[in-house]
Design a protein with these regions (language model features):
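Glycine-rich phosphate-binding loop of ATP-dependent small-molecule kinases
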Residues: 1-192
Length: 192
């Protein structure tokens, strides 16, 4: 199986690339955001627990997010692996993912891919996306810059986790979409 952690700051094209990688390698993208929305909307036990923390203005503990992920992995069979999007965000989550994959699937993360894009390019892309989509979080340059800073704060420690395992690669996220996909695929194929 090919299990990939996909990193990319807001506006890096991560969602677009994940779709191409899903098709090419028969993978299932697991997005933390999608998992949260499903559990909250459907009032699952984990969704109610997460909501109780959010209602108090607290971050949802790693354990709750990890349990959502574990449940999600059980739902999807018949794929050649997974693309983890938005998880792990901390070293604790990365270590939990290692354990879950080993215990539940007898697998491991093969590679952590990070799309690299200059901050000014990201800001430009997001402002343009904000005009097209009407998303408030993509319309304010100050908010965009804060999101980018927050992204790097959260992912730096996780990148170090995978670098220490020899499972980390950076790919230029600027250029033609097909070229970026080819570069990501070449990195994945080194581990297949």
């Amino acid at each position: 199986m090919i299990n990939i952690v996909l990193f990319g700051p807001p506006g890096s094209g991560k969602g677009t690339q994940a779709k191409f990688l899903e098709e090419k390698f028969n993978l299932k993208q697991l997005s933390t955001g999608d998992m949260f929305r499903f559990n909250l909307k459907n009032q699952t036990e984990l969704g109610k627990l997460a909501q109780s923390y959010m209602d108090q203005g607290h971050l949802v503990p790693d354990e709750v997010t990890t349990n959502m992920l574990r449940d999600e992995l059980k739902k999807h069979t018949g794929y050649s692996g997974f693309i983890f999007d938005g998880y792990p965000r901390t070293t604790t989550q990365a270590e939990s993912l290692d354990v879950i994959l080993k215990e539940d699937l007898g697998q491991e993360v093969k590679i952590c891919l990070s799309l690299k894009v200059d901050d000014e390019v990201l800001v430009g892309r997001l402002l343009e996306r904000g005009k097209e989509s009407g998303r408030a979080d993509d319309a304010n340059e100050e908010v965009i810059r804060e999101r980018i800073v927050e992204y790097y704060k959260k992912t730096d420690e996780v990148a170090e986790h995978y670098k220490a395992q020899g499972k980390y690669a950076e790919v230029n996220g600027v250029g033609e979409i097909a070229e970026i996909t080819a570069n990501l695929s070449a990195e994945i194929e080194k581990f297949v």
